[in-house]
């Protein structure tokens, strides 16, 4: 199945980051929080401005991002894999390596 996001929506695959306590112990299960990092799988056509123009999104497919997982973030299954659908405004940063 293929999902194509609309407007300023972005589809992200969460990337798991190893969680460690302050003392260096690796946390697992319920002690570890879900990562707020991911990889952009698809982007919409852009944000529609008040004057009707479409502004292209700053993120692109393949970008590694840090996002805010809050209200408005939708979780879906895509080919058996969990993906997130969110607005570009929920993306806090692009990670450059």
Swiss-Prot record:
One protein family per Pfam: Cpn10
A GO MF label: ATP binding
Record InterPro entries: Chaperonin_GroES, Chaperonin_GroES_sf, Chaprnonin_Cpn10_CS, GroES-like_sf
GO cellular component: cytoplasm
Principal place of residence: cytoplasm
Domain of life: Bacteria
Gene3D superfamilies given in the database record: GroES chaperonin (2.30.33.40)
GO biological process: chaperone cofactor-dependent protein refolding
Keywords: Chaperone, Cytoplasm
Family, as annotated: Belongs to the GroES chaperonin family.
Function comment: Together with the chaperonin GroEL, plays an essential role in assisting protein folding. The GroEL-GroES system forms a nano-cage that allows encapsulation of the non-native substrate proteins and provides a physical environment optimized to promote and accelerate protein folding. GroES binds to the apical surface of the GroEL ring, thereby capping the opening of the GroEL channel.
Family matches, as NCBIfam families: PRK00364.1-1, PRK00364.1-2, PRK00364.2-2
Name of this chain's protein: Co-chaperonin GroES
